[in-house]
Amino acid sequence: MILVSQLRWDDWNRAHIAKHGITPEQVEEVCQGPYIVRQGYKGRLMVIGPDGAGRALVAVLDPEGTDAYYTVSARPASRRERQIYQREKGGGAP
C-alpha cells in the first residue's frame, strides 16, 4: 500500500478544492483512513476513500519525494468510483 504521510498545500489548491465543496481537512481525513489508490494522469495518484463523515472523495495527488504529495484536486467520488472502493474494501460505506 502507498503511504500518504504528508500533503503539500498552497493558496491555489485550497481554492481549487473549495470549488468542489471540499476542505483540506477532508482530504487529510481521506489520506489517513482506509483508502485505495489508482494511477492517474501524468504519474499522479487518485486516492479514493471516506472523509470523517463517511462521504466518499477522490483526491488527486502529485508525488513530491518519499511519502509527500502535492494536492492537485479533490472532489466527491463518482458512483463508479464508490463501487470500485466498495468492491476492493469488502462492501459497506462509502
Please name every model-derived segment:
Residues 1-94:
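Ribonuclease/tRNase effector modules and their secretory precursors
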